[in-house]
């Protein structure tokens, strides 16, 4: 199995943080369980300097995982490198043989371009959120992957969080009644736009980068259709720092269920939390129904750590946590699961020579869930949140007017 990972930043390797990211630890855990005889991960970064920093992270993660590389063929390679300082992911796509799949973790504004090129080379592709920024681009990608009979997924890992699965179970059981509203508060530390994403933060906004998770989640829980959107944003602190993007955005989405019941979702998102906040992300969701409500504080998960060396910490043990098992490190959580289920699905497909099968003899949904987890997000489903983002961005540019979703 040969995996191409395009992008080598914080989420892939933990570069710029004291962690090892989420994507590569997920790949480690996938191989630890499956012990595939020939297993290779190719990392494609933007420049030689970044790839060198990420390479150190990758090699250290492998070392502390204590995977016996003499028994498991686990090869990693990095581009650009000393011999090929100008080589990019485009060269790898063109020249590398027998790639199994691609994982795309690049800045938001590059998603369409990179995903499109992966599909051009017939690769099952997993992309981090958001899927795309424009609906027309989402439609093009969906059409292409269907024509080529390959799979495309977007890594909306909040669908795998047991907090949110409990919300879905409560909603589906109808014990909370008909939906009236969802209220979401979601924020991250200033270090994210100011340092970690400084080179491209001005090309996105906090709703696209972060809030989209909970737009997708409301669709996942209710299967409702977004009808119209209103968004208001504030530019202050980041603009003074030379980063021309919104500090905070408030967004109202009107949804309609299959039973023609309308409800609203209100999101308040920002990425200017103090850097000494007790967690990287502060996140809460509340559902109000005609028979009851559901509240989930997804930052305060019952753990606080205080030491002389650090401020108070409230870690999230459910997302992606490194645990010591004897002398080795293992990573567990719904963030890990969201990626390993994609790799498991690709392996099933490859073992069954899926591309040459009668793809359209069954419904696309049945075929999708034969290989992937029920919580997985197809390109088709991810296009729902893209439509909301596009309308929200139009609202921001037009005096925060309501924008209908087409």
Residue ranges and their predicted role:
Residues 1-121:
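N-terminal glycine-/serine-/threonine-rich beta1-alpha1-beta2 phosphate-ribose binding loop
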Residues 9, 153, 158-244, 251, ...:
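Predominantly a Rossmann-like dinucleotide-binding segment in NAD(P)-dependent oxidoreductases
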Residues 22-32, 55-60, 165-171, 251-254, ...:
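Short, well-ordered amphipathic alpha-helices
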Residues 49-54, 329-340, 357-360, 380-384:
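Active-site loop of classical SDR/Rossmann-like NAD(P)-dependent oxidoreductases
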Residues 123, 150-151, 178-180, 261-265:
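Short, well-ordered coil/turn segments that N-cap beta-strands
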Residues 209-310, 325-352, 364-369, 389-393, ...:
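Contiguous beta-strand/loop segments that form the cofactor/metal-binding neighborhood of enzyme cores
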Residues 352-384, 404:
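Glycine- and charged-residue-rich phosphate/anionic-cofactor binding loop of Rossmann-like
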């Amino acid at each position: 199995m040969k995996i191409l990972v395009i992008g080598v930043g914080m989420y892939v390797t933990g570069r710029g943080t004291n962690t090892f990211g989420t994507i590569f630890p997920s790949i480690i855990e996938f191989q630890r369980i499956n012990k595939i005889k020939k297993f290779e991960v190719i990392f494609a970064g933007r420049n030689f300097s970044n790839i060198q920093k990420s390479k150190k992270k990758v090699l250290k993660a492998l070392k502390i995982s204590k995977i016996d590389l003499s028994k498991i063929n686990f090869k990693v390679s990095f581009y650009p490198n000393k011999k090929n300082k100008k080589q990019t992911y485009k060269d790898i796509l063109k020249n590398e043989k027998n790639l199994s799949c691609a994982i795309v973790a690049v800045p938001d504004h590059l998603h369409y371009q990179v995903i499109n090129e992966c599909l051009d080379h017939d690769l099952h592709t997993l992309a981090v959120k958001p899927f795309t920024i424009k609906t027309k681009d989402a439609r093009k990608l969906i059409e292409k992957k269907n024509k080529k009979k390959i799979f495309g997924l977007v890594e909306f890992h909040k669908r795998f969080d047991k907090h949110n699965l409990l919300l879905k179970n409560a909603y589906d059981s109808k014990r909370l009644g008909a939906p009236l509203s969802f209220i979401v508060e979601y924020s991250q530390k200033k270090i994210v736009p100011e340092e970690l994403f400084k080179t491209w933060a001005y090309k996105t906004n906090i709703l696209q980068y972060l809030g989209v998770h909970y737009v997708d989640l409301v669709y996942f829980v209710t299967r409702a259709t977004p009808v119209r959107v209103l968004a208001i944003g504030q530019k202050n602190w980041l603009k003074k720092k030379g980063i021309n993007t919104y500090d905070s955005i408030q967004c109202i989405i009107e949804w309609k269920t299959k039973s023609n019941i309308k409800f609203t979702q209100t999101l308040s998102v920002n990425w200017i939390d103090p850097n000494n906040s007790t967690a990287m992300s502060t996140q809460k969701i509340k559902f109000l129904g005609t028979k009851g409500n559901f509240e989930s504080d997804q930052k305060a998960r019952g753990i606080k750590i205080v030491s002389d060396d650090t401020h108070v910490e409230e870690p999230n043990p459910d997302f992606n946590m490194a645990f010591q098992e004897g002398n080795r490190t293992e990573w567990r959580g719904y963030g890990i699961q969201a990626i390993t289920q994609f790799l498991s699905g690709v392996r099933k497909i490859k073992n069954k020579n899926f591309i040459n099968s009668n793809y359209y003899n069954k419904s696309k949904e049945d075929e999708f869930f034969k290989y992937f987890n029920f919580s997985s997000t197809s390109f088709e489903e991810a296009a729902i949140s893209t439509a909301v983002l596009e309308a929200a961005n139009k609202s921001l540019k037009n005096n925060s007017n309501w924008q209908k979703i087409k």
